[in-house]
UniProtKB/Swiss-Prot annotation:
UniProt entry tagged with the keyword Cell membrane: no
Pfam families in alphabetical order: Lactamase_B_2
Highest taxon listed in the record's lineage: Bacteria
Similarity annotation: Belongs to the UPF0173 family.
Keyword Cytoplasm: no
UniProt cross-references to InterPro entries, sorted A to Z: Metallo-B-lactamas, RibonucZ/Hydroxyglut_hydro, UPF0173
Keyword terms, alphabetized: Hydrolase
Protein name according to UniProt: UPF0173 metal-dependent hydrolase RBAM_026340
Amino acid sequence: MKVTYHGHSVIQVETKTHNIIFDPFLTGNSLTNLKPEEVKADVILLTHGHNDHVGDTEQIAKQNDALVIAPNELAVYLGFKGLKVHPMHIGGARQFDFGKVKLTQAFHGSAVTDEENKTITYTGMPAGILLTIDGKTIFHAGDTALFSDMKLIGELNHIDLAFLPIGDNFTMGPEDAKLAAEWLRAKQVVPVHYNTFPVIEQDPDAFAESLPGGVGKVMAAGETIELA
């Protein structure tokens, strides 16, 4: 299984039979050269409705006839746009043909902002996503603050790879993310949601080096790792 980081919070997971992408914010993402029209995906997983996470979902979903899995209100909102959606909610899990998806809580917001019309559309609660696929469990925390139930998530799940935001200001920063990594007990932890904009500038290497046991891993935008 191949896992690729495309900057910000964009993660792509490729197996022999499926291609899954998390939070496909490509247009406006200064850290990647990947274009929406280049993306091949049959599943799109969304953590919440902010524009820097929903990103190019509509284009990618329509050109690939991809299934969009998202928190309920966001899924319904995208369904109104003609996308094929599957709504879920926090605490809920479902087995799909590609693997198992479970939504966890995240402490953040969730809304689609239309700057041209000066409107904000509420899209339910934000979430983290546990994806169990090909015998491995990947945790995408979404945008979130540190919260103590991360301990429970770590106790209940054997997480092989966790993606944690470190940008601060809108999410937890490096210090809180370090504690989150400890609580989640993932075998490998990759920082995300940093350096896309000046307000979330961080040193990912310093964060990774601060994690005990060598579990920290910085992925450059476009880098792929094998998860076997």
